[in-house]
Amino acid sequence: MNKSYENSGRFGRFGGQYVPETVMTALMELEESFNKAKEDSKFIDEYMYYLQEYSGRPTPLYYAENLTKNLGGAKIYLKREDLNHTGAHKINNVLGQILLAKRMGKKKVIAETGAGQHGVAVATGAAMFQMECVIYMGEEDCRRQSLNVLRMKILGAKVVSVESGTKTLKDAVNEALRKWVENIEDTFYVMGSVVGPHPYPTMVRDFQRIIGDETKEQILKKEGKLPNYIIACVGGGSNSMGIFYPFVEDKSVKLIGVEAAGLGVDTDKHAASMAKGSVGVLHGMMTYLIQDDEGQILPVYSVSAGLDYPGVGPEHAYLKDTKRAEYTYVTDQEALDAFGYLSRCEGIIPALESSHALAYTMKLAPELSKEEIVVVNISGRGDKDVDTISELNIFG
């Protein structure tokens, strides 16, 4: 599972454990449990069982024939993470972490959520494994994603609306971490992305790499060769890290992460921490952040609630610095256009997050030859976004 660039919780200069002493004990306990679990065939078998029987894996790698024909360039395949139980890639990681929580004897799980997809996945897993569940969500995100708030409550979770700061994902993470520190003995913090202090970025990636492992097997079966490009959206970066990781050493495969440019990267309304950020520390890790000269985190914005995080996973920061992956961005408008385009051209309504990856693909594919292959990670379905779309009144 390990690549040579990992060094005790760091990816080059990124990552680490910038946390108070009270949290270090819990992180050490977590790391030890995770390291034992991933070498235990019984744990791996149980994890794979639930991925298949409960979540419905493997997800298809679908040849988007209409999209390919309309754009007139490379062959486009869609990795259909939207077809997972709960409608996104988040469940891959949640099932792994909740199984780990059970193994560690924890009674309660807590989590943060932005778009609500991770919260729904945690509430789902907690219901299945009969564990108490509390989800922290920014007040602004609760408003934008009211459907997911209701889903979490139906599943038996308590949803706490966080009213501090910008009332979005960053503030939800802060509150969840604070509560975890207060209840470390019996509580497991289910981190939703490849962010936070070590071992979370590594652990979440290892639970998400199933996306890339399946993609590699599927594309070789369908095409007899690896793709030329893999494209995925990046907020914290777990769907992208999950599909990128098994291809990191396949140098012929170009890895492209797409951030949210919001109203434009030259405005103060975006969430492109790779394009416009600088290195700093947030939520226990060193990475690229959107911050001022004093190191204060600045407000971020995206039409997509799952991408408005002011940082990025440390492994992504490392892949950027070493030029193994390329990071770009698209605006709200481009993502909304792609959302409508895929819906009408393939009958697949993608999440607004995934629509960012799709928007960049729509720019790139026409410039490529018909022999080239592009895989786009459709990280989630767009049902959760119909409220947002309705407010924007785009489709009448």
UniProtKB/Swiss-Prot annotation:
Catalytic activity: (1S,2R)-1-C-(indol-3-yl)glycerol 3-phosphate + L-serine = D-glyceraldehyde 3-phosphate + L-tryptophan + H2O
UniProt keyword annotation of Lyase present: yes
PROSITE patterns reported in the protein's UniProt record: TRP_SYNTHASE_BETA (PS00168)
Record keywords, A-Z: Amino-acid biosynthesis, Aromatic amino acid biosynthesis, Lyase, Pyridoxal phosphate, Tryptophan biosynthesis
GO molecular function annotations of the record: tryptophan synthase activity
Cofactor: pyridoxal 5'-phosphate
CDD domains recorded: Trp-synth_B
Superkingdom in the source lineage: Bacteria
Modification type N6-(pyridoxal phosphate)lysine: residues: K90
Enzyme class (EC, first level): lyase
InterPro entries: Trp_synth_b_CS (IPR006653), Trp_synth_beta (IPR006654), Trp_synth_beta/beta-like (IPR023026), TrpB-like_PALP (IPR001926), TrpB-like_PALP_sf (IPR036052)
Entry EC number(s): 4.2.1.20
Protein task: The beta subunit is responsible for the synthesis of L-tryptophan from indole and L-serine.
Self-association state and partner proteins as the record states: Tetramer of two alpha and two beta chains.
HAMAP family: Trp_synth_beta
Protein's name according to its UniProt entry: Tryptophan synthase beta chain
Organism name: Clostridium kluyveri (strain ATCC 8527 / DSM 555 / NBRC 12016 / NCIMB 10680 / K1)
Lineage: Bacteria, Bacillati, Bacillota, Clostridia, Eubacteriales
